[in-house]
Amino acid sequence: MIMRGESNTYIKVKSVLDNSTPEDAKRNKNLIYLFTLLKGSSLIIPLAYNGLIMHENILILCWTAFSVIYTVLSMFKVLDVLEGETVSHSRYIYLAYVFGNLIFALSIIFHIM
């Protein structure tokens, strides 16, 4: 159910931001936070589930913990941007996150680890 709603998350947040002034966006930041939280939970729940199933492998358990922490921290960056702060992402950490999730998914599919 949450996974199906994830595709509309960016559309809803973008429409709220496009159709409002900066003052209105600050008032609607709880709504934007809710959409971001739903998107993050749709990623965290499968990662935690896979980490619990495959708990005999310490690498998968560590990667699940890192992914959950990174996802939660990136969700809070939305609120910082609404407050007017500029938030820079570390390109190397983001690339490690993307490629790590790719390796994680392939290891589940092909039972490599």
From Swiss-Prot:
Keywords per UniProt: Cell membrane, Membrane, Transmembrane, Transmembrane helix
Membrane topology: Multi-pass membrane protein
Keyword Protein biosynthesis: no
GO cellular component, one term: plasma membrane
Segments passing through the bilayer: 34-54, 58-78, 93-113
Subcellular location field: Cell membrane
The keyword Calcium appears for this protein: no
Superkingdom, taxonomy of origin: Bacteria
Protein name (database record): SPbeta prophage-derived uncharacterized membrane protein YosW
Source organism per UniProt: Bacillus subtilis (strain 168)
Source species taxonomy: Bacteria, Bacillati, Bacillota, Bacilli, Bacillales
